[in-house]
């Protein structure tokens, strides 16, 4: 009997020490205001008995679970101080995502999933080059300042967001800003001749500016003297006749610009005015496109921020709503969805019209296979 009491005494001591330690941890969380409690919540905790403190804490921890978890790690393992709002890898996070999760991290495709899809859909998807040997390139052209048009305030958010996204997808990104139509064409032609395309498996072109139905506005655009880079010109520069290095490889064109004119409020509109088609678009050029498009133009997909004749909207403090939704959908779904599915997710996010409505549109789709980005692979 005495021996039994002797054995129980150390256990009671350990139990008491454990309670004291846990209570100290919980007190630390409250004192550092990790849970962002109001004074009455703190009072309720401090007034509770020791055995009730865990229950009181649990009732208030759901919304602050991540922050409290990091503080617990710091307390138990004495790791370096990390801000509760700081992420270890802000641009990448292993997939798959949890249901209903909101995140600003790019979900990575598990290597096993990458291998499975490559094997099962080998005849249906574009081949992906080895990460260590490929040299993917992307080009962003963004005009924000104009001689005769209002500035595109907030476009810097679009540049930053798209650059980070494409770099996360393993593209080296070139950024060109505030170019005339002629300079935009020169930049595109120079980009098309880059030798890195030979060892790449795809490319992205991101064009952001004021726009009209037929193309993207340069920085000196005026109603009386248009300065417009025609969309047809972009496709001609990168077709299989003029850019052999990207033959049979996905060429993704993303356009944030109006494709018509309309008046609006609250949001800044990406349209200079109601303009007629530029006279520089000759019928001869159109005939050439019509004859050779089937033979020369292949493996393209264009994703425009709005339907023809309509405007696109931009928040001057946050960036374009199209680019914002595009980045979000790439982050959430590119690990498991092919490109067209990701674009459809973007369209679905605009399905219910808002106060200022627009509908992103997939156009000039000539891809013969599915294009998976397989982030992280």
Curated annotation (Swiss-Prot):
Effect seen on changing residue 152 to A: Abolished ability to cleave IL18
InterPro entries: CARD, Caspase-like_dom_sf, Caspase_cys_AS, Caspase_his_AS, DEATH-like_dom_sf, Pept_C14, Pept_C14_caspase, Pept_C14_p10
Consequence recorded when altering residue 291 to N: Abolished interaction with Gasdermin-D (GSDMD) and ability to mediate its cleavage. Strongly decreased ability to cleave IL18
Propeptide feature ranges: 1-80, 271-289
EC identifiers of the protein: 3.4.22.57
Domain notes: The CARD domain mediates LPS recognition and homooligomerization.
Record's protein name: Caspase-4
The species this protein was found in: Homo sapiens (Human)
Gene: CASP4
């Amino acid at each position: 009997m005495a021996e039994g009491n002797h054995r129980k005494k150390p256990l009671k001591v350990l139990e008491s020490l454990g309670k004291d330690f846990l209570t100290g941890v919980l007190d630390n969380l409250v004192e550092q205001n990790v849970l962002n409690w109001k004074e009455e919540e703190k009072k309720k905790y401090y007034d509770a008995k020791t055995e009730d403190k865990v229950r009181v804490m649990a009732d208030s921890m759901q919304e602050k679970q991540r922050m409290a978890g990091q503080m617990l790690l710091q307390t138990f393992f004495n790791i370096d101080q990390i801000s509760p709002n700081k992420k270890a890898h802000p641009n990448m996070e292993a997939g798959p995502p949890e249901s209903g999760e909101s995140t600003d991290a790019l979900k990575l495709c598990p290597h096993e999933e990458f291998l499975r899809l490559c094997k099962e859909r080998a005849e249906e998807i574009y081949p992906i080059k080895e990460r260590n040997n490929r040299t993917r390139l992307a080009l962003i052209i963004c005009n924000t300042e104009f001689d005769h048009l209002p500035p595109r305030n907030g476009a810097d958010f679009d540049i930053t967001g798209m650059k980070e996204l494409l770099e996360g997808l393993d593209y080296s990104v070139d950024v060109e800003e505030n170019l005339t139509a002629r300079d935009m064409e020169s930049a595109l032609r120079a980009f098309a001749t880059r030798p890195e395309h030979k060892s790449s498996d795809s490319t992205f072109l991101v064009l952001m500016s004021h726009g009209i139905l037929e193309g993207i506005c340069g920085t000196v655009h005026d109603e009386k003297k248009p300065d417009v880079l025609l969309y047809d010109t972009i496709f001609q520069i990168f077709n299989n006749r003029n850019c052999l290095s990207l033959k049979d490889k996905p060429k993704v064109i993303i356009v944030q610009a109006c494709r018509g004119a309309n008046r609006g409020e609250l949001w800044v509109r990406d349209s200079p005015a109601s303009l007629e088609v530029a006279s520089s678009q000759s019928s001869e050029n159109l005939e050439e496109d019509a004859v050779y498009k089937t033979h020369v133009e292949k493996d393209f997909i264009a994703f425009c921020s709005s339907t023809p004749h309509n405007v696109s909207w931009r928040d001057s403090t946050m960036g374009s709503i199209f680019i914002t939704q595009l980045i979000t959908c790439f982050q959430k779904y590119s690990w498991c969805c092919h490109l067209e599915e990701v674009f459809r997710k973007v369209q679905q996010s605009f399905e219910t019209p808002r106060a200022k409505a627009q509908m992103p549109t997939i156009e000039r789709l000539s891809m013969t296979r599915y294009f998976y980005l397989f982030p992280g692979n």
